């Protein structure tokens, strides 16, 4: 009988090589290094396969029909009952969970940043790392557990994304506030989003990297992070770097909320309105335990364990109750703020906060639990709402006109929780308001064209004298402004409006004659075709010409739909954030951009919602179509420009070509004949990425194969159509 094997505990196994005094520790799989640990500068292609179907436990992905079947009235009744059903394991402050849910919703939606459209509450990221463990989200793990009975009961009729955001909205209604409405329709993702750059700091509440080189200028916060400290949704409530300077705090507030696409009125409304409810928690000096992501198994996903509960709860370390009625909507936040002079004090946990001078209002404020009394307190950032000249002018008016505060808060709150949802065509449910706002990027519903109309218009475009390059480029420029992060941009006819008309990437001088010709065709047609449809249809005509020239007969799909947005329906300042800093698909690099072009390409592909194969085939096709910015020959690896061939990949993978940096040292490369040394091609960093990166080269080789010529055309058409329809949420209905 063989001797039974013995094994050391997991993580402690060792191998002793023969005649070696240097044991090699074998790590368990969870501790193994990744490719990115070895090669941290490699492009991250994982972000091009976000939330893949393989990890989605639902049968067919997000079920909008199930959401539409939700009995909203019954659901609201159940939710309202939950609000005041205090649980011993996490008692409700003042007998009402409403303020906790407002904070949860606010902190979910408030991660949005307008710079790249990432963040927000639209994909249910708050339960996942890193957000679930941010210091600013202490105790929100409990808020989500309180909601579990509702989620369990209603299942796929309401996503976690919707439930988390809805909770704050309905809670405020239950506490007497009239909201502007609510839209369901947020899908759940099943893994953390790893394409969001939150900052470079390696410690919670760090700020040194995001202000590197700022020399004390708080407006020079690194982009795109929107908050001054790692792990904060907004600003440090104690003041910048913990310094209780409310005027300096106002600078941070304006910068941070501006990056959330909020103006001064919206910012003031959100702070004043939000702080009408509830309290902060810092009643003792006990320390929180570890965050949820690092907590021991037996805590079952909850974190920050400590003995404090009820009146002894500790979260932020600040102990502030703003009003006498923390579960009721009124104007008392401003009334208290302006009726007292304030002096600096410390919370029991040692945090900087403010109380009325001369011990005013002592023993007149409710405690979270029981009948005890305390005094009002304010955060440093609350005082910014009074003493900053701009915020002060706004809030002083609201002090005397509370109805205006209510109106502005309703609008700002609705914007906060819907900003990342995209167009109103994605809004579901009976609570959607009829009113629309400029920030929603409204595009009027369009007319469905008949097959005869489409054929007539295609013929007119084909006979217009516009080249394949002009047609393809214009369609790409219009559609490629789309970003899947907040579902903004895309077509809609805005390519001829400011600011897009003036973007460097769109080559205004080259664009003008194309716009004029398409408008001429539109005016001559009695079909009612929109300019937006003509732009896409022009791309179809150009592609089909290029496909035919390559010897194939492949139709390019087209579905008519959207009408044209008007200039007055376009927020120029907000749309300016959609301007690409680089577009590797057309070999465009913005002047002065310090980010390598290949990183910009991956980011652009990610924002377009493309997979790595789709990105690859589009690059190869656009190069041979001559679609480069400025007519550049970089990466145009064909002598048959305008034909949709796989020449790009054939020549890119040709070992008869030797590549070297161009003599000008301008980030471009020259390909020479390996035998003769004669120059053959020029290319960009983006182009060589598809020959040098192991994964992308594998894809390039597929399209370079002799039997892939037709596959290449069909795959290009499919990827092209995906980009053209990226903003067509009406097609998903």
Curated annotation (Swiss-Prot):
GO CC terms in record: cytosol
EC numbers on record: 1.11.1.21
Domain of life: Bacteria
PTM summary: Formation of the three residue Trp-Tyr-Met cross-link is important for the catalase, but not the peroxidase activity of the enzyme.
Residues flagged as site, Transition state stabilizer: 103
Pfam families attached to this UniProt entry: peroxidase
Cofactor: heme b
PROSITE patterns xref list: PEROXIDASE_1, PEROXIDASE_2
Location of region: Disordered: 1-35
Active-site feature positions: 107
Cross-link Tryptophyl-tyrosyl-methioninium (Tyr-Met) (with W-106): residue positions: 234-260
Cofactor details (free text): Binds 1 heme b (iron(II)-protoporphyrin IX) group per dimer.
Cross-link (Tryptophyl-tyrosyl-methioninium (Trp-Tyr) (with M-260)): 106-234
GO BP terms, alphabetized: cellular response to hydrogen peroxide; hydrogen peroxide catabolic process
Catalytic activity of the protein: H2O2 + AH2 = A + 2 H2O; 2 H2O2 = O2 + 2 H2O
Gene Ontology molecular function: catalase activity; heme binding; metal ion binding
InterPro entries recorded: Catalase_peroxidase, Haem_peroxidase, Haem_peroxidase_sf, Peroxidases_AS, Peroxidases_heam-ligand_BS
Record keywords: Heme, Hydrogen peroxide, Iron, Metal-binding, Oxidoreductase, Peroxidase
Protein family per UniProt: Belongs to the peroxidase family. Peroxidase/catalase subfamily.
NCBIfam families for this protein: cat_per_HPI (TIGR00198), PRK15061.1 (NF011635)
Subunit field text: Homodimer or homotetramer.
Function, in words: Bifunctional enzyme with both catalase and broad-spectrum peroxidase activity. May play a role in the intracellular survival of mycobacteria.
Name of the featured protein: Catalase-peroxidase 2
Source organism: Mycolicibacterium fortuitum (Mycobacterium fortuitum)
Gene: katG2
């Amino acid at each position: 009988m063989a001797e039974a094997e013995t094994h050391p505990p997991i993580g402690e196994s060792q191998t002793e090589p023969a005649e070696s005094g240097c044991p090699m520790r074998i790590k368990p799989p969870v501790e193994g290094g990744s490719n990115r640990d070895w090669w941290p500068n490699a492009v991250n292609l994982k972000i091009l396969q976000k939330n893949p179907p393989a990890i989605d436990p639902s049968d067919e992905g997000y079920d909008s029909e199930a959401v539409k079947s939700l009995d909203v009235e019954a659901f609201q009744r159940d939710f309202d009952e939950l609000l005041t059903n205090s649980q011993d394991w996490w008692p409700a402050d003042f007998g009402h969970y409403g303020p906790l849910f407002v904070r949860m919703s606010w902190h979910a939606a408030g991660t949005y940043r307008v710079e790249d459209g990432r963040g927000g509450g639209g994909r249910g990221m708050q339960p996942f790392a890193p957000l679930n463990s941010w210091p600013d989200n202490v105790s929100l793990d409990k808020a989500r557990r309180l909601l579990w009975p509702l989620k369990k009961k209603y299942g796929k009729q309401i996503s976690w994304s919707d439930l988390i955001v809805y909770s704050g909205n309905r809670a405020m209604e239950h506490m007497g506030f009239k909201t502007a409405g609510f839209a369901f329709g947020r899908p759940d993702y099943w893994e953390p989003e790893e394409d969001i750059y939150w900052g470079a700091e390696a410690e919670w509440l760090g700020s040194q990297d995001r202000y590197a080189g700022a020399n004390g200028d708080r407006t020079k916060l690194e982009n795109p992070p929107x908050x001054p400290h790692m792990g904060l949704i907004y600003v440090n409530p104690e003041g910048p770097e913990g310094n209780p300077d409310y005027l300096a705090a106002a600078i941070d507030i304006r910068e941070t909320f501006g990056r959330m696409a909020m103006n001064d009125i919206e910012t003031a409304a959100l702070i004043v309105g939000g702080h009408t409810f509830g309290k902060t928690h810092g009643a003792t000096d006990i320390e929180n335990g570890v965050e949820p992501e690092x907590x021991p198994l037996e805590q079952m996903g909850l974190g920050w364990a400590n003995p404090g509960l009820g009146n002894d709860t500790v979260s932020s370390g600040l102990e502030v109750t703003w009003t006498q009625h923390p579960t009721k909507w009124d104007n008392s936040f401003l009334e208290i703020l302006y009726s007292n002079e304030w002096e600096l004090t410390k919370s029991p946990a040692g945090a900087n906060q403010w109380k009325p001078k001369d011990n005013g209002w002592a023993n007149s404020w409710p405690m979270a639990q029981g009948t005890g009394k305390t005094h009002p307190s304010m955060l440093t950032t609350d005082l910014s709402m009074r003493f900053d000249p701009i915020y002060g002018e706004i809030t002083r008016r609201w002090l005397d006109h509370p109805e205006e505060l209510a109106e502005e808060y309703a609008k700002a709150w609705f914007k906060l929780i819907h900003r990342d949802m995209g167009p109103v065509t994605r809004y579901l449910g009976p609570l959607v308001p009829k009113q629309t706002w400029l920030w929603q990027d409204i595009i009027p519903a369009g007319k469905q064209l008949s097959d005869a109309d489409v054929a007539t218009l295609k013929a007119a475009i084909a006979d217009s004298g516009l080249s394949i390059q002009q047609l393809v480029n214009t369609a790409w420029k219009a559609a490629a402004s789309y970003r899947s992060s907040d579902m903004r941009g895309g077509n809609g006819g805005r390519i001829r409006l400011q600011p897009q008309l003036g973007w460097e990437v769109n080559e205004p001088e080259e664009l003008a004659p194309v716009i004029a010709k398409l408008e001429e065709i539109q005016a001559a047609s009695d079909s009612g075709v929109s300019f937006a449809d003509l732009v896409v249809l022009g791309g179809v005509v150009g592609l089909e010409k290029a496909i035919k020239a390559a010897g194939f007969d492949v139709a390019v799909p087209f579905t008519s739909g959207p009408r044209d947005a008007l200039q007055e329906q376009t927020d120029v300042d907000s749309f300016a954030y959609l301007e690409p800093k680089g577009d590797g698909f057309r070999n465009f690099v913005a002047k002065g951009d310090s980010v390598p072009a290949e990183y910009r390409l991956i980011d652009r592909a990610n924002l377009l919602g493309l997979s790595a194969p789709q990105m690859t085939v589009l690059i190869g096709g656009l190069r041979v179509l001559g679609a480069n910015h400025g007519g550049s020959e970089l990466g145009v690896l064909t002598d048959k420009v305008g034909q949709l061939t796989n020449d790009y990949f054939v020549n890119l993978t040709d070992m008869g070509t030797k590549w070297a940096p161009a003599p000008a040292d301008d980030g471009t490369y020259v390909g020479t004949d390996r035998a003769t040394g004669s120059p053959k091609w020029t290319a960009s960093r983006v182009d060589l990425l598809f020959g040098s990166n192991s994964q992308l080269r594998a894809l390039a080789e597929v399209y370079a194969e002799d039997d892939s010529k037709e596959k290449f055309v069909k795959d290009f058409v499919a990827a092209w159509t995906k980009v053209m329809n990226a903003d067509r949420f009406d097609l998903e209905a």
